[in-house]
Amino acid sequence: MEDPAAPGTGGPPANGNGNGGGKGKQAAPKGREAFRSQRRESEGSVDCPTLEFEYGDADGHAAELSELYSYTENLEFTNNRRCFEEDFKTQVQGKEWLELEEDAQKAYIMGLLDRLEVVSRERRLKVARAVLYLAQGTFGECDSEVDVLHWSRYNCFLLYQMGTFSTFLELLHMEIDNSQACSSALRKPAVSIADSTELRVLLSVMYLMVENIRLERETDPCGWRTARETFRTELSFSMHNEEPFALLLFSMVTKFCSGLAPHFPIKKVLLLLWKVVMFTLGGFEHLQTLKVQKRAELGLPPLAEDSIQVVKSMRAASPPSYTLDLGESQLAPPPSKLRGRRGSRRQLLTKQDSLDIYNERDLFKTEEPATEEEEESAGDGERTLDGELDLLEQDPLVPPPPSQAPLSAERVAFPKGLPWAPKVRQKDIEHFLEMSRNKFIGFTLGQDTDTLVGLPRPIHESVKTLKQHKYISIADVQIKNEEELEKCPMSLGEEVVPETPCEILYQGMLYSLPQYMIALLKILLAAAPTSKAKTDSINILADVLPEEMPITVLQSMKLGIDVNRHKEIIVKSISTLLLLLLKHFKLNHIYQFEYVSQHLVFANCIPLILKFFNQNILSYITAKNSISVLDYPCCTIQDLPELTTESLEAGDNSQFCWRNLFSCINLLRLLNKLTKWKHSRTMMLVVFKSAPILKRALKVKQAMLQLYVLKLLKLQTKYLGRQWRKSNMKTMSAIYQKVRHRMNDDWAYGNDIDARPWDFQAEECTLRANIEAFNSRRYDRPQDSEFSPVDNCLQSVLGQRLDLPEDFHYSYELWLEREVFSQPICWEELLQNH
């Protein structure tokens, strides 16, 4: 039995592989033609047009609202409408909601809130559904989707002004503490959407209010803007001695992951948590504004550019070429012919750079010729999440598709200017001067960067250039201040910490932060498309699976689309939430950022993200797991169509899925945040063989995604070896063209790696010690501090009033015998000392 041809090879069959002399020569043209046709097909399959994607805080308003609901919930829209209309007819005669004056609408809402305060769960649920119908835009009285969105926003502001959010917050506390619902869900073999009805209604109302009020528009009246700021303050700070709202949602996430509440609608919880954090702390553009303000407060020079605008102006690069596998090597001309071509061509060219010389040395040599290393399993350094879930697959990586590049030497065309201003750190200048002084004068001057005596003129010019591009980050200032506070705690006094929303959130999360991070990563792992179904993994489909499983094929297809969409939305919310937390904590204080980062790394976040990208990212980004006719608000205006193959396949004609591309970019940004300037974590990227995984993501022609992939490749380039750099020159050129340069950063060569053995464990331990010292100094307030003043006056101490517990007099004689009479006391010496 003949072995099947290797996947992706273009070699001829057994009779044309070179065996048998003349037969092989006769079959060569056919084999070459077959290889060319296969190559054309593969080029067409991987060709991706430039994606017109605009990165932002979130998707469009309608899309963000529609993702709140699963398609299984669509039948509940009519249920909400019926509950509202039944209640409305008993209170208002002969009018519809939109016909009422604002005062009458407010009076009706007050009546609804009063009717929520009943003992019966069924009656309470009906009234809550009526409130949800208002928040959904009273779609029964609207003619278009625009009207539904308009009245949804109007009603949400009205509901907030009447105190609906605080009322629903109390109901949410009751449902979270409802032990009967938890025990009922635990007893069931399979939890379905029916087990979380009350929670889904409450969370939906709260999400609609947060999302609609969060959205700012120029036409908003003054009252709405005031209400928005008041709402933001209520969500940010502890009200009535209660924790901030985000902490309540975090506790729901941990309770769900611990298995104590499997019926929680986790998608709605995560969406609401993400939007609350974004609303209270600010989105990505607001972060840039805060960064500019903070630099001005610290007396630092302004930023050289706005990173968001620079990325938006970038153009996507063509993906690098890939291996042509066995077919190319079989059909390539003999080396002697190549040498002849190379020699004749060199006679015509007098000046060539090293890249052109390298390309001409072997015209058929494309990137990644040695695929043995990259085709090894990405799970060689296999890790587990909480000891139960594999984080790296053991299946071999899929070989890269054939090259798109023509079989000729290519020249790399660089733009006129690089997009980023180069940066230099203070320690880079110190390191440069240390090497220069050792070379020219034989000794060093420590951290002195001003004394240049004895150094040649070119070194003077180099130092001048380095200082012109010196960049002092906010983190550098914060670390320096922290070192001074550790050295001189008494003389510098107590640090004044402003009570910002970010600071309050960190204080609330501090002691449970490891559990929060592990819970989020567990859910992210369960939602990743590369995850394998396991019996011991958490069930994230409780709020999407119907009570009765589908019977027909079409119903199964619909549920399959719904489940995939459900997972995509969870990935989107978690990735954006983690990125927002990291960026805000980094701006607030660098050690807050490092604390969160370290717990993410300890929970195996790095291999988890790499596992996510160990799939066909192009297919994931272009996946169409949506049914447009079932999306809100479209499904509320039109009658639900009969389930057919056409209605399932009917959807938007966009070339990509916004949320999936958004998730991929955020996960790459998250990975970049965790590994930047951390050699131990960069080595994790190398150990887990991330280079081929990341490089395949470059096939997606979107500038921002490519930028963060190239950043991650740049981090580990020096560790990948000379052969990898030689065979990936186009990737190296793309890094040079798109990623910011650090002067005297030897990223492309790695000459000093062997001379610099990193103690990775010591690096993380030192960072952890600094974090613990920061948290202890700022947030631990022990009563008997070593820095608190001591009262040495005997009379003063004896005269102090000491509050004793009420039951102390029962054991007073025993205490007197044990602590006073049985202890030898030299009274003369005691009196002499005082």
UniProtKB/Swiss-Prot annotation:
Q: What InterPro entries does the database record attribute to this sequence?
A: Far11/STRP, Far11/STRP_C, Far11/STRP_N
BP GO annotations: cell migration; cytoskeleton organization; regulation of cell shape
Residues that the record marks as modified (Phosphoserine) are 318, 329, 354
> According to its UniProt record, what is one Pfam family this protein matches?
N1221
Q: Which compartment or compartments is the protein found in? A: Cytoplasm
Bias category Basic and acidic residues: which stretches? 30-43
Key words of the record: Cytoplasm, Phosphoprotein
| Acidic residues compositional bias, start-end | 369-379
Q: Which GO terms describe its cellular component?
A: cytoplasm; cytosol; FAR/SIN/STRIPAK complex
Coarse class of the protein's main subcellular location: cytoplasm
Residue numbers spanned by region Disordered: 1-48, 321-345, 360-382
Could you tell me where the Gly residues compositional bias lies? 8-24
> How is the quaternary structure described?
Part of the core of STRIPAK complexes composed of PP2A catalytic and scaffolding subunits, the striatins (PP2A regulatory subunits), the striatin-associated proteins MOB4, STRIP1 and STRIP2, PDCD10 and members of the STE20 kinases, such as STK24 and STK26. Interacts with CTTNBP2NL.
Q: What does this protein do?
A: Plays a role in the regulation of cell morphology and cytoskeletal organization. Required in the control of cell shape. Calmodulin-binding scaffolding protein which is the center of the striatin-interacting phosphatase and kinase (STRIPAK) complexes. STRIPAK complexes have critical roles in protein (de)phosphorylation and are regulators of multiple signaling pathways including Hippo, MAPK, nuclear receptor and cytoskeleton remodeling.
**Cited PANTHER family:** PROTEIN REQUIRED FOR HYPHAL ANASTOMOSIS HAM-2 (PTHR13239), STRIATIN-INTERACTING PROTEIN 2 (PTHR13239:SF6)
> So what family is this one in?
Belongs to the STRIP family.
Protein name, UniProt field: Striatin-interacting protein 2
